[in-house]
Amino acid sequence: VVHATSTGAMYSDVAERYAADDYMQKGTVVMIGGTEEITEATGEMTDRVFGVTSTQPAFMMNSSAGNNDSHPYIAMVGRVPVRVIGTANKGDRIVLSDTKGVARALAANETANCNQVVGVVLQNKTDAAENTIECVVQCRV
């Protein structure tokens, strides 16, 4: 069953609410676990990546569960800002960094399986600091 008021959307991701064990910034990489359903992802290049907290989902599933602080929307698929540290080039794959909840570009000499990849970068990032950048993501289970 689809409940909709139009066939288009202003934003670009499909997201679902999940119970979080703590408040999470928008663009945070998450994994299943913690004291609730999801927690900030840990472990550089982990294959337990589940998704990314959404900023403005186009389609919101499980919308009556909690609020943005207790049950953030997790982008299941689509275009979403992701917290990334270090430089990244458009088209780079991103994986979890050694910083909790933050991704990084996969280095040229590294390989990753599909469960380690958070998404693909849509814009160049030229500084080393942590910032959010647009990426295409897909939920992993």
Predicted regions and their residues:
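Extracellular receptor-binding modules and their adjoining Ser/Thr/Gly/Asp/Asn-rich linkers
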Residues: V1-V141
